[in-house]
């Protein structure tokens, strides 16, 4: 007879958020390098459970252990016990349900909240919609897909996310971001 656990575990994230991804295998015992997208790299371990997608299906994975190794962080997942098993997970995104993330203070937001926001200059020129965010060494960057009839013939704009300097106002209610930016760039 199989014993069923009374603890109900989520089968799939309701509102999936990517927190990082698994890199190449390390050693022969199933360890993997991990790349964290969280502001403080180690914070990725604070949010559980983790999910991955294999062949279009969600799978929950259990973190057994993690440690620093040289410049990398490496992880050991439960049931991943050799290099071959670890290699199957290389490049898998590490996903959690948004309910695992901390509640934000008034006026704060996650990158995911900015996706799809309309970006308008302080002069009222519509630059387009946020389609992605990029991390650079110095600051984050909004990737904005320009409108089809953009007067400057621009398809995509990269606008530095410099709060106060370039970013003048973020309004998640109206899904808009006001920026001090030359539309010709």
From Swiss-Prot:
One of its GO terms (biological process) is ribosomal small subunit biogenesis. InterPro entries: PRC_barrel-like_sf (IPR011033), PRC_RimM (IPR056792), RimM (IPR011961), RimM_N (IPR002676), RimM_N_sf (IPR036976), Transl_B-barrel_sf (IPR009000). GO terms for molecular function: ribosome binding. Residues 106-185 form the PRC barrel domain. The PRC barrel domain binds ribosomal protein uS19. Belongs to the RimM family. This is Ribosome maturation factor RimM. It comes from Shigella dysenteriae serotype 1 (strain Sd197). The gene is rimM.
